[in-house]
Amino acid sequence: MNNHFKCIGIVGHPRHPTALTTHEMLYRWLCAKGYEVIVEQQIAHELQLKNVKTGTLAEIGQLADLAVVVGGDGNMLGAARTLARYDIKVIGINRGNLGFLTDLDPDNAQQQLADVLEGHYIIEKRFLLEAQVCQQDCQKRISTAINEVVLHPGKVAHMIEFEVYIDEIFAFSQRSDGLIISTPTGSTAYSLSAGGPILTPSLDAITLVPMFPHTLSARPLVINSSSTIRLRFSHRRNDLEISCDSQIALPIQEGEDVLIRRCDYHLNLIHPKDYSYFNTLSTKLGWSKKLF
């Protein structure tokens, strides 16, 4: 065992059969190599592991040096929103579909992870967004997002009228089905499917991408990540929502605004030493190969 990581947490999809196989392999392999291992409680229950140290995501974030997330990007997003609050590094083994965030190959995970555990890795600091639904002199409802914060109707799709302020200065008004506010990490997710630009992970930028706008002049906008975005609504209604990473929904009540800003903390995402962001884009999006 080396000195780069001493305590490793295992988290991810607790009920997917192939993911559970990877969880079990990972647990036994890490224990055999002498690491202290903490297994997320639900995973330990599904695997029927005995005499194993278990913990919640928050406890793993507090105690472990590295968290290995087994699953797809959705599992990574769910875990990362909690783990980003702590001084812990995170890496993913892909048991999902695209795998933009979980980039270890499950068939070669042992060797790739062995190299990482020896200190052969690169680290990226991915920032999060914080969304607040608030009314003057009232308690705020707050959530965070790794990928994006989305304004949308709560149930049936319909047009929304709203104003966008950037650093408390009016920027534009819009009539559309919603708005996607994305980090660079999320620029290859929902934002991309709505026509937004791809941002490299190190950019300090946020994108605002309209969803089915009712005018051809509405275009994606890229702003500095230090800016604060305020959304105000022309017709007070009780059927609007803000969703974070398509996993957490915050309802917007009459008279409330939405504030979106960069989080004070970030996700320490690590990759194998040979990781290339542009190679990942080319592979996942089916870009053309080199000509010569």
Swiss-Prot record:
SUPFAM superfamilies: NAD kinase/diacylglycerol kinase-like. The keyword rRNA processing does not apply. GO terms for molecular function: ATP binding; metal ion binding; NAD binding; NAD+ kinase activity. Its main location: cytoplasm. It catalyses: NAD(+) + ATP = ADP + NADP(+) + H(+). Its cofactor is a divalent metal cation. NAD(+) binds at residues 73-74, 147-148, 158, 175, 177, 188-193, 247. Belongs to the NAD kinase family. HAMAP family: NAD_kinase. This is NAD kinase.
